[in-house]
Amino acid sequence: MNIYLVGGAVRDQLLHLPVKDRDWLVVGSTPDELLSLGYLQVGKDFPVFIHPETHEEYALARTEKKSGSGYTGFICDFSPDITLEDDLIRRDLTINAIAQDKNGKLYDPYHGIEDLNNRLLRHISPSFEEDPLRVLRVARFAAKFYHLGFAIAPETLELMKKLSTQGELQHLTAERVWLETEKALMTENPEIYFQTLLKIDALPALMPELATISVENFQYAMTALKNAVSLIKNMDCNKSAVCFATIFLGIIYVNPSHMTQKQQEQDNHQKNITPCLFEKLKVPAYHKELAILAGKYHIYIHNAFNLKSHTIIDLFNKWDVWRKPQRFLELLIVCAAHYSAQSKNQPTYPQKSYLLGLYQKAMTIDVKNIVSAGFKKTEIRNELTRQRISAVEKIKNCYP
């Protein structure tokens, strides 16, 4: 039995990146042998085991043979005579097919190290096209490693486009599409993921709402997305939710010069695409809530300086800022990202600090003092609202 470190851990180690998860490959063994050593079997379709002490994953070397459509139609062979090379060739990219033994020796039968040095994402073999999920994975890797200068090899890009035009992507479940998309949203350059899918004509099958917007709107959405990533850098927030809401707002975007006249038109467009987009991708509830808030209220936030105090408190109540201040901040970030994309001559977004300041002032009103003053039942809420409006009004008067 021989054990090798494989996959992303070896790749990231060679790129001098932090290694998050370590996956191990076991060659020349059987399920019974690993079970006798105390490993816990967790794999259903093929044997994957959890180490009794480190709790890291160990998989038996295997081969895969296509037996149907989509990404689940495979027959696996994990007999002990499967070699290291047999297992590595079934992987998606050469840079993910490098192994390392216990002594640190590297095994690179498919020239992954050369592609790492050349910053290329290249598929290993024609079997790449047997698994349509790899199209999304490669697009995600393109986004993940873009800041390091990586690009997709032309022949791999061509194969990805072939899979797309043949309709193979339609076999992917919404859950798997969202999983890869969410991972892409967490990268430093998520716009590369969507630009890659556009380039290979994959968007109509995966995200038709994004595929049907104009070229101008798509470019605008990608600019806003880059802005969002920049704004939340080093921040403790739900990055994938912020990025998704930013893209959503890009889809329903109406040119600011026509915003007033087309407001109703935009609202109708949003109502039409909202359930379709969220259902198509199985978007988590939090992401959906943030996106809907951004779509419904971004114009109010852009025009924050013109809002009356009672309107601001009413909006704060609708946004539930009192219980969900983090979501409020993320909503402002989404709007700031779009404002910067719209107004290139005004990169700052004073509305964000303005509304945060009003929120912080309104939060100084203590409901306990209102109760102590003798207010009861509905009177408490009415007085709380009155005092919050008054507090906000004082801050507003300090602004020109």
Curated annotation (Swiss-Prot):
Keywords assigned by UniProt, alphabetized: ATP-binding, Magnesium, Metal-binding, Nucleotide-binding, Nucleotidyltransferase, RNA repair, RNA-binding, Transferase, tRNA processing
Swiss-Prot/TrEMBL GO biological process terms: RNA repair; tRNA 3'-terminal CCA addition
Swiss-Prot/TrEMBL cofactor(s): Mg(2+)
UniProt-recorded name of the protein: CCA-adding enzyme
Enzyme Commission number(s): 2.7.7.72
Superkingdom as given in the UniProt entry: Bacteria
Miscellaneous note of the record: A single active site specifically recognizes both ATP and CTP and is responsible for their addition.
A molecular function (GO) term: magnesium ion binding
